[in-house]
């Protein structure tokens, strides 16, 4: 028993469970002075925003202080990563502390937009001042977002899984309810349900295959014995981005939806804004095509976030490693980036077919939105499980060695 509790993996796991208890407890703290009987307070975007909030640690159903979730932080990470590719801005050349501070400023700006959009549309109880309630709830929602960011950082340093655990628990708590409500709303024949179950099994197999498949690049390591050289490889995933594109595209596309809600409240009689908001509404052709395009784009972007050729080439050069037939430095970086680009396109096409293809059914019936998002949900869920599994496996690896003395 003492040996079990002395395990690093067990200690980190228990700390993660403690943080999850805090998260679940906070998600039950309801925003004050709000009429909870009104469910469709965000108009036509309620279903999508509630679903996307559940994927990012939020919950627009219970209207708690964690309703917005980690969506502002995730959207800020996407924008920061895009800005970092610009050499003119020079964001990546600044100190780490400055970069973190600027990312938090960007997170705050997005959190203000989303929190204010939600607060302005909240059904406030008539006996209280609407302005004060909106102001107070906006501050509470922003504070809830930053509290979740803090919990994620704590879990990354002292627990297992980082922010993934919070997102995973939110999905487990909220998504099944959304799916069951869809089956109650939309009549689906039994034969179609059986077919969907079979397709789910096939999709799960393909998903595991894509996540575990690796392209091995032989690497020569200085000081490694000749008989071990055949085991020395640089591994590149067949789908380098994994399930991250789907997770972040849901967060990223929710920002314009919140922005349109906010602008619609500020300019209620603006015909151009109303027309644009209507065209970009969830389930409309413009939104579906943008969703599929951004999903493919994020598949490429996050592939390079996961496998950065410059960083890998620099690390190999410093440690005296090199790829057979490739000069160290710039040539190695170019070689790795070409491979990553090639596999990111393959992964992007896989993501578009599996997670983007079902969204085309939404063009015929918007009630199928939640069901159409299930394949992408599987991709996101599978990526999280594999990530946590690999982290636990790495923690337990050090415990397999016995001390010499």
Swiss-Prot record:
As recorded in UniProt, coiled-coil segments are: none
Check the record and name the InterPro entries matching this protein.
SecY/SEC61-alpha, SecY2, SecY_dom_sf
Gene Ontology CC terms: plasma membrane
Top-rank taxon of the source lineage equals Bacteria
Cellular localisation? Cell membrane
Under Gene3D superfamilies, the record lists: SecY subunit domain (1.10.3370.10)
Q: Which UniProt keywords apply?
A: Cell membrane, Membrane, Protein transport, Translocation, Transmembrane, Transmembrane helix, Transport
According to the record, the segments passing through the membrane are 14-34, 63-83, 104-124, 131-151, 156-176, 191-211, 247-267, 285-305, 343-363, 368-388
Chief localization: membrane
Q: What function does the entry list?
A: Part of the accessory SecA2/SecY2 system specifically required for export of possible cell wall proteins. The central subunit of a protein translocation channel.
NCBIfam families hit by this protein: acc_sec_Y2 (TIGR02920), PRK12417.1 (NF009082)
Q: How does it assemble?
A: Component of the accessory SecA2/SecY2 protein translocase complex required to export cell wall proteins. May form heterotrimers with SecE and SecG subunits.
What protein name does the entry list? Accessory Sec system protein translocase subunit SecY2
Query: What taxonomic ancestry is recorded?
Result: Bacteria, Bacillati, Bacillota, Bacilli, Lactobacillales
């Amino acid at each position: 028993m003492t040996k079990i509790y002395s395990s690093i993996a067990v200690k980190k796991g228990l700390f993660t469970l403690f943080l999850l208890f805090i998260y679940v407890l906070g998600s039950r703290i309801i925003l004050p002075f709000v009429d909870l009987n009104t469910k469709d307070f965000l108009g036509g975007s309620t279903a999508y925003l509630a679903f996307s909030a559940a994927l990012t640690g939020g919950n627009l159903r219970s209207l708690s202080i964690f309703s917005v979730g980690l969506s502002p932080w995730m959207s800020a990470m996407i924008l920061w990563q895009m800005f970092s590719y610009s050499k003119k801005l020079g964001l990546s050349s600044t100190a780490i502390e400055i970069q973190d501070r600027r990312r938090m400023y960007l997170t705050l700006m997005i959190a203000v937009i989303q929190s204010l959009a939600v607060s302005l549309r909240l059904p406030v109880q008539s006996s209280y001042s609407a302005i004060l309630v909106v102001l107070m709830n906006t501050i509470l929602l922003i504070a809830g977002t930053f509290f979740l960011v803090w919990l994620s950082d704590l879990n990354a340093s002292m627990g297992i899984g980082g922010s993934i655990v919070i997102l995973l628990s939110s999905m487990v708590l909220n998504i099944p309810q959304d799916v069951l409500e869809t089956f109650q709303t939309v009549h689906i024949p039994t034969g179609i349900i059986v077919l969907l179950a079979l397709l789910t099994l096939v999709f799960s197999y393909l998903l595991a295959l894509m996540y575990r498949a690796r392209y091995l690049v032989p690497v020569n390591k200085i000081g490694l014995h000749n008989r071990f050289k055949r085991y020395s490889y640089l591994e590149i995933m067949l789908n380098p981005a994994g399930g991250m594109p789907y997770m972040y595209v849901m967060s990223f596309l929710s920002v314009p939806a919140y922005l349109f809600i906010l602008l619609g409240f500020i300019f209620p009689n603006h015909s151009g804004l109303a027309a644009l908001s209507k065209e970009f509404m969830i389930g409309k052709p413009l939104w579906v095509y943008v969703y599929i395009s951004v999903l493919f784009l994020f598949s490429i972007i996050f592939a390079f976030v996961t496998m950065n050729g410059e960083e890998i080439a620099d690390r190999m050069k410093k440690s005296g490693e090199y790829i057979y037939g490739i000069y160290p430095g710039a040539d190695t970086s170019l070689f790795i980036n070409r491979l990553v680009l090639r596999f990111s396109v393959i992964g992007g096409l896989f993501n578009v077919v599996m997670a983007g293809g079902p969204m085309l059914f939404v063009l015929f019936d918007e009630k199928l939105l939640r069901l159409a998002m299930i394949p992408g949900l599987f991709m996101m869920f599978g990526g999280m499980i594999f990530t946590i599994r690999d982290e636990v496996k790495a923690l337990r690896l050090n415990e397999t060695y016995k001390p010499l003395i």
